[in-house]
Amino acid sequence: IHIQGMNQPSLEVFERDLYAACAGKEALILDVRNNGGGWTTDRVLASIMAPVHAWTTPRGADPAMTGHYPQDRLFIQRTTMPINLLCNEKSYSNAEIMSHAFKTVGRGTLVGMPTHGSVISTGSFSLEDGTTVRMPFRGWYVADQSPRDMELNGAIPDLMIPQTPEDESTQTDTQLKVALEDLLKRVR
């Protein structure tokens, strides 16, 4: 699933597509490449980190029939299947926070190229002449053994795979191919 932006419209598409994309599948690849950011990392993480605490079966069915949970009971769509996340040097801001978070919590393999390192929270206000000024008001830090400021410190993939001009000209997605191969090793 490609997450185009870390914003409400993209979140709604992600939540809709998550259920369909996971049906009958064993693994999932999320893609935040070429994503300018936004604010929805925590909501996406909630969908891929929610634990399975129970399952249901219809009355009289074999109780060994596992894996079904009533979708109307879920607050958000969720998956617990193996996941890899794609990022690149055009993953900015909240897409970088997503990449750092995915790696920090160990949810799967981060694949691609290091993100740009452009992570801050900004607000904006208008001046009397009608221009708008944006000001940073918050820094973001990786929550691991050595907290690092995400500003100027992009997320470093577990598998660094460049997307070359030759790949682009032949429409070959080497990063996606490597992410898929890595997932197949984990599910087999």
Sequence positions of predicted segments:
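Cleft-lining beta-strand/loop regions that shape enzyme active-site pockets
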Residues: 1-128, 168-174, 181-187
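C-terminal structured "cap/appendage" subdomains that terminate the fold
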Residues: 107-166
